[in-house]
Every structure is written in structure tokens, then in C-alpha cells.
A protein has these predicted regions:
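Conserved beta-sheet core of the metallophosphoesterase superfamily
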Residues: 116-188
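Short catalytic/ligand-binding loop motif for oxyanion handling, primarily in non-cytosolic enzymes
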Residues: 40-43, 94, 110-112, 142-143, ...
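Catalytic phosphate/metal-binding cores of nucleic-acid and nucleotide-processing enzymes, i.e., regions
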Residues: 4, 44, 49-50, 56-57, ...
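N-terminal active-site segment of His-dependent metallophosphoesterases
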Residues: 1-21
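Active-site neighborhood of divalent metal-dependent phosphoester bond hydrolases
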Residues: 14-93, 99
Length: 188
């Protein structure tokens, strides 16, 4: 059976993120990483809420998710979703064929905050000798410098960025999927 790895930021900016979370939660071959948007949700609605986090979350597109969780979901359903988010890892190490990958939302690091918030630079040296890091969080146009073409998966030195701006407002945005078996790219 094939597996789908989702490297975070499923919620926010557009309606329907909560429904997507439910599908991921209930699908055995879907694996999700914690992204900064899920962390902002946890910081606002989770059991260890952080003062000021609601404003940061809403300023970063969280209003749809906030309203869905507070006013559409039942308290039981909301608690299940918050629990699901609280159990998400912030990175995966996977092996596909003879390739090893380190999947992380934002940037490979020993620091958990960096793994969901920090942005790599296109000229960063490889993070690993034995595996390829696959990240999101930073739209690929900032890695490639190409602001005129539809966003495309960016391949660097031991680093692949797959964030093609799906959550952004630009018409150049796309949802990208990278098949790890052969690194073939798919776009919606």
C-alpha cells in the first residue's frame, strides 16, 4: 500500500481544513507532520495555551479554522482534533527504495521550534550526508528567485522544497506532491 506524507499546514487560510484533518486522522496510510499553523492552533485552543497566540494565529490566516473548531464542531469533536494535532510528530525519517529522506515542515534542526518555523536558504550546505531533506513552509519562489512562473518544487543541495504556495493568494500558487520513489512531481 502506498503512503501519503503531509508535511504540515493543512489548516488555515481557506475553509475546509478541519474536514481534511478528519480524513487524515481516519486514513491509515496518511501520515501528517506538525506545521506552524497546527502549532498556532494548539497554542490557542490546546490545553497549554500561550498568551497572545490567538492574535498571531488569526493574523496568519487562522480565522476559518478557529471558527470551524469553536462554532461548527461539537466540543467532543474539537477535543479529538486538538488531541490529534498534539500527537503529531514534527519530522519523519523514511526510506524509499535505496533513498533516505528526512521530512520536516520548515527546516531540519535539533531545535523543535526551528523544525516548524525557521526557513532554509537556497545556499545552505546539505543538512545530512546520508539523506535528502524534504521541507515545506517556505514558498519555492523564495528559494528559486522566480516570482513570475507557477511555483514549482525546488531541488537544492540535499534539500527539496515542496511548498508551492497553495495557501497564498497569488495565481501562481499550486499544491505540489513529490513521489519519493522516483522524485516525480505532481501539481494541482
Amino acid at each position: 500500500m502506498n503512503s501519503l506524507y503531509i508535511i504540515g499546514d493543512v489548516i488555515d487560510r481557506h475553509p475546509g481544513g478541519v474536514e481534511i484533518l478528519k480524513i487524515i486522522k481516519d486514513t491509515p496510510n496518511m501520515f501528517m507532520l506538525l506545521g506552524n499553523h497546527e502549532q498556532m492552533c494548539l497554542d490557542t485552543l490546546g490545553p497549554n495555551s500561550v498568551y497572545g497566540s490567538r492574535r498571531l494565529w488569526l493574523e496568519n490566516g487562522g480565522s476559518n479554522t478557529y471558527r470551524e473548531l469553536l462554532y461548527v464542531c461539537s466540543p467532543t469533536e474539537r477535543n479529538r482534533i486538538i488531541h490529534f494535532l498534539s500527537m503529531l510528530p514534527d519530522h519523519f525519517d523514511v526510506e524509499v527504495g535505496d533513498r533516505k529522506f528526512h521530512l520536516v515542515h520548515a527546516m531540519p534542526s535539533d531545535d523543535p521550534d526551528d523544525r516548524i518555523w525557521r526557513r532554509p536558504k537556497p545556499d545552505d550546505p546539505p543538512y545530512f550526508e546520508d539523506r535528502i531533506a524534504v521541507v515545506g513552509h517556505t514558498p519555492t519562489c523564495y528559494m528559486s528567485g522566480d516570482m513570475e512562473s507557477p511555483f514549482a518544487v525546488w531541488h537544492g543541495n540535499g534539500l527539496i522544497d515542496i511548498d508551492c504556495g497553495c495557501g497564498n493568494k497569488t495565481e501562481l500558487r499550486r499544491l505540489a506532491c513529490l513521489r519519493l520513489d522516483d522524485l516525480k512531481e505532481f501539481y494541482i
